[in-house]
Swiss-Prot record:
Gene designation per UniProt: NAT8
Single GO molecular function: transmembrane transporter activity
Membrane topology listed for this record: Multi-pass membrane protein
Keyword Transmembrane in record: yes
UniProt-listed InterPro entries: NCS2
Species annotation: Arabidopsis thaliana (Mouse-ear cress)
Region named Disordered: 1-20
Keyword Transmembrane in record: yes
Protein name per UniProt: Nucleobase-ascorbate transporter 8
Cellular component terms per the entry's GO annotation: plasma membrane; plasmodesma
């Protein structure tokens, strides 16, 4: 019997079957990478889909600002159009001359606390005319944005950010990139649940269309079709369902907040929109005004945005199937992002722009990381910002539908950060400490600031100088900022620093991408058009 047992025993598993998954410096499975555009019909549809996704934040942020000032719907529409117009221009600049990644540049939540503090500043309370008060506030935000933009411009174009990010390893990038997505969870289900009857169907349909149906369909063409256009399919179906509920009187006797969240004719955007209007600089009744406190506070928000953008750019490069972004290219992109903030200030957009996290997640859903798609999306932004009536139709998509999209997009960006762990040695106690401690503190510190602000209506740092309060409270309320800065500090200062540690940190994998010339693929993905790299070389 013992002999029979030996004879029937399974042969030992081959050693190669037990090997870990191979490390990939480029993400495979992307149908169209950074430099390979889809056919034009698909490119146009995919570009329109990116435009739809970025509209959510473009509408939500001006709506929040206007609600605190009691301004007219016409002013809200004017803000939305301006922000959309500037976002389109900034996206084109970024794709042609900045990082050259398929990154949509849209409204940033990083600046909202600071802009809100300007909106609520006591110096505007003496202005009795609501319209004049609104215009004066907008001019104050303009002045703060114009000066704060030079932080990005100087840090980026001087090469300072290049020198900083050369010390960034895969290990320290994990919390930074992960929390660029996961850290925005407040914009997900909590906002979806404001109208659960349309938010929940949207997220269910989106997951079915993007994850289940492609695997059930026969043939690669059908599978890719649902991957690429899951957002359009699900949004159209649920938007139509919400419209039927609206005209059927489902929300006629509900609370005003429910109507704002659920109705498809909310907020008077369509009726207040002009047919044609071209946004222009200095449009708020006079020149920008400058306040030292507002400027310092806005610069703090700008620095937070700079750090968060770095994490999102890394995620975008991953989902575009490009090589890790060289520090010189990243610094160049930060400089152009600063130029975009300057445009926001000059045009009076009411908020600054940054790389869009939700559109970075959409790259993963569609598995299309083409630069041309994003350039087409920028064209849609500019076009619909001028043709206000048509743009307002799409801007009236209920916020819970947008929040349902965020649940998937932010998850993908966060997962892109976690995927960088493949370059690190998780059996190292040094790695475990840096990852665990930075992630925990990235959750715990902002939560303390949030709870304190919720209970006391002001942050833990409270002095007579509001600008100083914002300089401290705003950065430590950002999960990506806290976890990213902490991981970067620990990773660069914590001993030992030997060859084994470099391998544990993942530096051996990213070493050849620290210099632009070290890998031929950097030239393919990140070189400037029109032979401009000859005159503006990357190092």
């Amino acid at each position: 019997m013992a002999g029979d047992g030996v004879e029937n025993a399974k042969p030992p598993q081959k050693q190669e079957d037990l090997q870990p998954h191979p490390v990939k410096d480029q993400l495979y499975g992307i149908t169209y990478c950074l430099t390979s555009p889809p056919p034009w019909p698909e490119t146009i549809l995919l570009g329109f889909q990116h435009y739809l996704v970025m509209l959510g934040t473009t509408v939500l942020i001006p709506t929040m600002l206007v609600s605190k000032i009691d301004a007219r719907n016409e002013d809200k529409v004017k803000l939305i159009q301006t922000l959309l117009f500037v976002s389109g221009i900034n996206t084109l600049f970024q794709s042609f001359f900045g990082t050259r990644l398929p990154a949509v540049i849209g409204a940033s939540y990083s600046y909202v606390p600071t802009t809100m503090s300007i909106v609520l500043a006591a110096r505007y309370n003496d202005i009795m005319d609501p319209q004049k008060r609104f215009e004066q506030i907008m001019r104050g935000i303009q002045g703060a944005l114009i000066i704060a933009s030079f932080l990005h411009i100087l840090v980026g174009f001087s090469g300072l950010w290049r020198n900083v990010t050369r010390f960034l390893s895969p290990l320290s990038a994990v919390p930074l990139v992960a929390f660029s997505g996961f850290g925005l969870y407040e914009q997900g289900f909590p906002m979806l649940a404001k109208c659960i009857e349309i938010g929940l169907p949207e997220i269910i349909l989106l997951v079915i269309f993007s994850q289940y149906i492609p695997h059930l369909m026969q043939g690669e063409t059908c599978s890719n079709f649902f991957h690429r256009f899951a957002v359009i399919f699900s949004v159209v179906i649920v938007w139509l369902y919400a419209y039927i509920l609206t005209i059927g009187g489902a929300y006629s006797n509900t609370e005003i907040n429910t109507q704002i969240s659920c109705r498809t004719d909310r907020a008077g955007i369509i009726s207040a929109s002009p047919w044609i209007r071209v946004p222009h600089p200095i449009q708020w009744g006079g020149a920008p005004t400058f306040n030292a406190g507002d400027i310092f506070a806005m610069m703090a928000a700008s620095f937070v945005s700079l750090v968060e953008s770095t994490g999102t750019y890394i995620a975008v490069s991953r989902y575009a199937s490009a090589t890790p972004i060289p520090p010189s290219v990243l610094s160049r992109g930060i400089g152009w992002q600063g130029f975009g903030i300057l445009l926001c200030g000059l045009f009076g957009a009411g908020n600054a722009t940054s790389v869009s996290v939700e559109n970075a997640g959409l790259l993963a859903v569609t598995r299309v990381g083409s630069r041309r798609v994003i350039q087409v999306a920028a064209g849609f932004m500019i076009f619909f910002s001028i043709l206000g009536k048509f743009g307002a139709i799409f801007a009236s998509i209920p916020a819970p539908i947008v929040a349902a999209l965020y649940c998937l997009f932010f998850s993908y960006v966060g997962a892109g950060g976690l995927s960088l762990i493949q370059f690190c040695n998780l059996n190292s106690f040094r790695t475990k400490f840096i990852l665990g401690f930075s992630i925990f503190m990235g959750l715990s510190i902002p939560q303390y600031f949030y709870q304190y602000t919720t209970l006391e209506t002001y942050g833990p740092v409270r002095t007579s100088a509001t600008w100083f309060n914002n300089i401290i409270n705003v950065p430590f309320s950002s999960k990506a900022f806290v976890s990213g800065i902490l991981a970067f500090f620990l990773d660069t200062t914590l001993p030992p620093k030997d060859k084994t540690t470099k391998k544990d940190r993942g530096l051996v994998w990213w070493k050849r991408f620290k210099s632009f010339q070290s890998d031929n693929r950097s030239e393919e993905f990140y070189s400037l058009p029109l032979n401009l790299s000859k005159y503006f070389p990357s190092h």
